[in-house]
Each structure stands twice: as C-alpha cells, then as structure tokens.
Amino acid sequence: QRQMCIRDSILNTHYIHTDRLMSEMVATVAQTMSYVIAILCFYLMHVSSFPERMKNGINYIKKHWKFLIVMFIISICASKAYEWIMELLPQSWQFNETQNELALNQLFKTPLFLPITFILIVIVGPIVEEIVFRHILIGELGKKFNFIFMGMVSAITFSLIHVSGAKSPLEFGAYFILAVILVFVYLKSNRNLASSITIHILNNLLSFMITIYTISM
C-alpha cells in the first residue's frame, strides 16, 4: 500500500508538472498571437503610409547605427551601475532579479518553449511595446499634450507595467533606466519608431542570450 501511495504521488506530481508546462505554453502562444495581431492591426491602420514608414525606419538605422549602438551600450552600463548601487544597499532592499524576469525565466527551462519564447521576447514584444509606449503615448498623444510631457508619462507607465508584481519598489529603477533611454532615442530621432524598436530588440536579445547561457551552465 505504501508503494502504491508513493507511485500515486509521483504520478500526481508528473501530471501537475505537465499541466503547468502546458498552461505556460498555451499562455505564451496566446500572448505571442495577440502581439502579432496587434502588429497586424497597426499595419492595417497605416497601410497606405507603411511602406514609407518602413523605408524611413531602415534609412535611419543605416544612417545612425553608430548612435544607436552607443545608446545601447549606455543602457547596459547604466543598468550595471544600478545593479552595483543595489549591492551597496541593505540586504532587505536588494533583489537578484525582478519578478518580471523570474516569470520569464520559467519559459526558458523547457527547450520546447525556446522558439516561441524568442519570437515573443526578442521580436514581437519589443515591437508592440514600442508601438504602445512610444508611438501612441508620445508620437500621437504628444501632439495634443506636449512630446516631452508624454515622454515622461511613457517612461513611467512602461516601468510600472513591468513591475506590477514587484516585491521591491527598487525594481522600478531597473526598467526606468531602459525606458528613459528608449524615450530619448525616440525623441532624438524625430519620433522614428525604428530607432527605439532597434534598441529594445537589442536589449531583449542580449537578455535572452544571457539567460540561455546562465541556464545551460
């Protein structure tokens, strides 16, 4: 009877683990599809001007790639400096990873998730977030409320969205640094969406590669 209980316990644990993985997979696919639909809607709303937007975006990246690389490096250095400052604070204030990062890390633990996780985190995620937080909040609403003011709103809301489940208020700073740089690049480029998308994709690509390397060690 004891052996049966142990067997049932193992089977139940297996089923729970499988169900959780399936739920995470479904949620990841659903989120990816919703992002793809959002990008498609953006395209349909700007279908007449989209080719010109794409051309301008590509031309900007070609012409100002050095500026974009410099800003990307600055974002990395600023983030590392923030992490270093966090290490000087009392232990109770510190955090190793943000709650958002911990949640995303679950997707990396199953190889089956990696292709869809890459698409979600590195490609469609940054594009959708830049459409919402830069194009809509700054590019569109900025025409009515002032671009600088909406840039501040964009940086704050972007950071808050990513720390909604945070256990430490200091997690806000980790995302605010990236948000400020994305806003600056977007405004500096005369609101060229390709500029901030490029920085955002590079940032997420680096995080993706580091996570893969860390998990494989």
Feature roles, as predicted:
Residues 2-6:
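Short, small-residue-biased leader/transition segments that mark boundaries at the very start
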Residues 7-30, 211-217:
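Juxtamembrane/transmembrane-helix boundary motifs at the membrane-water interface
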Residues 36-40, 75-83, 180-183:
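Alpha-helical transmembrane segments
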Residues 80, 109-217:
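Transmembrane helix-loop-helix hairpins at the membrane interface
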